[in-house]
Each structure stands twice: as C-alpha cells, then as structure tokens.
Amino acid sequence: TQIVNGVLTNQGVIPSTSPAARLRGGSELQPEESTNYTLGAYLSIGAFDVTADYFFINVEDRLNLSSDFTLTPADLATLTNQGIDASDISEFRFFTNQFETDTSGIDVVVSTDTEWLNGITNWQLAFNITTTEVVDRDPTLFDNDRVLLIQDGTPGTRWNFTANHNINQWRLLARINYYGDFYDNEAGGYFDDALLLDLEAAYTLDENMTFTVGARNVADEQGCSTSSCGTTPPSAFGLPYSQFSPFGFNGAFYYARFTYNLD
C-alpha cells in the first residue's frame, strides 16, 4: 500500500508473466546484454599526478520496473473469466526488458603534495560526469516519467576536493563534496544541486593508538525540500525531502573514534 495523490492505494510489483501483467504487455524476462569500452590515461605534470578514465556502456534488454498500470473494468472482467480475482489491486507494475540505454562518462583525479605549515598536505580533486540516455523503449511499458528517472534520477556531475594535512602526530582533513541536481519521479520534479563539507582531526598518541573526531556534512545540508524545489506534490510519501537524495536527508553527523592496533 502506498500514498498516491494523498490516497492510500493498493500497489504491487507482480510477476511479468502473470495474467494481469500480460494484459499490459508483460512477458518472460531475458538476460541483459551489455557492451562496454574504457580508456584510461595517467599523466605526471610537474608536481601533479593526473588520472583520466572514459567509459561507455550499452545495455540491451535492460531490466527495470515498468510504469504503473491500472486495470479497467473490462480487464477485471477478462481476468474474472479466467478465474482470477484482481479486484484488490488498484495499481501494479512489473519487471521488463523492453528498453535500451547508453551510459558514458569521465572520471578525473588530480593530486599533489605541498610542504608547508611545518607539515605536508595532500591535495586531491576527484571529478565525475556521467550521462545516461534511453535510446530505445516500448512506450506502452516505459513512459516518459520512467525515462526521466533513468536518465536524471542521479546527479550527472559529482566532484570532491580534499585537503589532508599531516603535521607531527596530527592529521587534519577537510573535504568539499558537490552533487548535481537530480530528478525524483515521486515528487514530480528536479531537486537542486548541493555542497557538503566534511571535517576530521586525528591525533596519534603512539604507534598503536589514535583518537579521531570529525563531522560529515558540517553545515547540516539536507537539500531543498519538495516545496522549495518547486516540485509537485509538496511532499512525497510524507517526506519533506527527496527519498532519492544522493547524500541523504539526515543532515550533519558527528563522531569520535578511538583506534588501537594490536600489532
């Protein structure tokens, strides 16, 4: 049971070969077939180490859930004549192979070390851009909303920049994480991009003991709410934030850790 437009609705995932699914084009599932290519390079440019990787993945007969379907009175009558009572299913969907996607992207990592402030800082920038396109589909099984979820349901761009400074017995870390915007089909719209900051400090007491304190998402970023992002409805399943958020919606997380090495 799920909430659809504020109403409790019986909704389920049924076998693709069940009589109800066959009325909407369901069939036996087939193995996915994929072709992928990768190309990588490493460069040392002065004090900088650079790695770059390109990837391309084509998936035919891709497995995913279909769009949501309802049964008409004529459908219910057809199933009843087959001895099947489907009156308690208001909406349903099923797994299907009826679409094909192309996914491509680039990963770049740049790192270097700097001696300063009586210690050494390792700097690292990791960048990713990924795009997915639905290149073929059966529109009766896979509607435009499902296409948007596959293509834009995760951020197309992500990067993080990390500074890790070591000085005597101390290690200090700061990291900025960026997530691009993404689509949530349940909320009916796009959610804004976001920047998160992580901080950590560790002190090595001796060769066996280390004490660490830190915080993930220091600024307590929860992402924009469904209403502030302009999505419809103003909440999805009662959640004020997207259930698909790549960084969650619980905000800041603080921790302390003591490590003892038995060696």
Task: Describe each region flagged by the PLM.
Residues 1-51, 57-58, 84-106, 111-116, ...:
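Outer-membrane beta-barrel signature, preferentially recognizing the C-terminal barrel domain
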Residues 47-50, 117-121, 169-173, 207-213:
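Repeated loop/turn-to-beta-strand initiation elements of outer-membrane beta-barrel proteins
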Residues 1-25, 68-94, 137-148, 224-246:
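Solvent-exposed loop segments that connect transmembrane elements
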Residues 131, 178-183, 202-263:
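C-terminal beta-signal and adjacent terminal beta-strands/loops
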Residues 190:
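Extracellular protease catalytic domains of secreted zymogens
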Residues 39-43, 108-112, 161-165, 199-203, ...:
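Residues on the lipid-exposed face of transmembrane beta-strands in outer-membrane beta-barrel proteins
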